């Protein structure tokens, strides 16, 4: 069972009751606090599109505390972040691993942050296949293409050479917030607003 806090806001027309995520959305804040899957991707994409329609010139702030998840779902979020007119500022709180780190690095240049004790982890995509040998071969070729595409995007977002990214994502590669800044996944470590 998921517990969602509610906040009460005083307005000129009385009190208004919001779930916390709706209230944050009002301030152009999106919180990704779980695994990246089709459901969370649909919610984040919808919020990005909504906030762009509200004001295409104001930044959106995407807070990330995620262990990662599905590549296709993460790419749906990433592509939407690049597609909309608003700058999307990304802030890692806690953990941004795998697709969470990919989304963190995909924020607007100069607006990618992590809190001091956050942890960031990059690695190659994983998957599995079953069936006939031909089907397994097709799946293996597809995941290698996906790995190449993800590494190309990370290289572009970090300024690192493709070969460096490819080597550094062969295994789980954990970084502190400061190490992630030095690597180019984020622009700076922040301690306060």
UniProtKB/Swiss-Prot annotation:
SUPFAM superfamilies recorded: ClpP/crotonase
One Gene Ontology cellular component annotation held by this UniProt entry: endopeptidase Clp complex
Xref: PROSITE patterns: CLP_PROTEASE_HIS, CLP_PROTEASE_SER
Gene Ontology biological process terms, A to Z: protein quality control for misfolded or incompletely synthesized proteins
Reactions catalysed: Hydrolysis of proteins to small peptides in the presence of ATP and magnesium. alpha-casein is the usual test substrate. In the absence of ATP, only oligopeptides shorter than five residues are hydrolyzed (such as succinyl-Leu-Tyr-|-NHMec, and Leu-Tyr-Leu-|-Tyr-Trp, in which cleavage of the -Tyr-|-Leu- and -Tyr-|-Trp bonds also occurs)
EC number per UniProt: 3.4.21.92
Localization terms from the record: Cytoplasm
Main location: cytoplasm
Keywords carried by this UniProt record: Cytoplasm, Hydrolase, Protease, Serine protease
GO molecular function, one term: ATP-dependent peptidase activity
Record text on subunit structure and interactions: Fourteen ClpP subunits assemble into 2 heptameric rings which stack back to back to give a disk-like structure with a central cavity, resembling the structure of eukaryotic proteasomes.
Similarity field: Belongs to the peptidase S14 family.
Primary role: Cleaves peptides in various proteins in a process that requires ATP hydrolysis. Has a chymotrypsin-like activity. Plays a major role in the degradation of misfolded proteins.
NCBIfam families: clpP, PRK00277.1, PRK12553.1
HAMAP family listed in its UniProt record: ClpP (MF_00444)
Protein name in the entry: ATP-dependent Clp protease proteolytic subunit
Designated gene of the protein: clpP
């Amino acid at each position: 069972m998921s517990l969602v806090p509610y906040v009460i806001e005083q307005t000129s027309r009385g009190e208004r009751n919001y779930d916390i995520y709706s209230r944050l959305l009002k301030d152009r804040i999106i919180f990704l606090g779980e695994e990246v899957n089709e459901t969370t991707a649909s919610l984040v994409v919808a919020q990005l599109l909504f906030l762009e329609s509200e004001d295409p010139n104001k930044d959106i702030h995407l807070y990330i505390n995620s262990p990662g998840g599905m590549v296709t779902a993460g790419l749906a979020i990433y592509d939407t972040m690049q597609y909309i007119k608003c700058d999307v500022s990304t802030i890692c709180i806690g953990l941004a691993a795998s697709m969470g780190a990919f989304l963190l690095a995909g924020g607007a240049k100069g607006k990618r942050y992590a809190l001091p004790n956050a942890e960031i982890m990059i690695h190659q995509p994983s998957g599995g296949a079953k069936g006939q040998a031909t089907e397994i071969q097709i799946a293996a070729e597809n995941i290698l293409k996906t790995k190449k595409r993800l590494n190309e995007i990370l290289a572009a977002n970090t300024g690192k050479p493709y070969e460096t990214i490819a080597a550094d994502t062969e295994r789980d590669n954990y970084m502190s917030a400061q190490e992630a800044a030095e690597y180019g996944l984020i622009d700076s470590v922040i301690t306060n607003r």
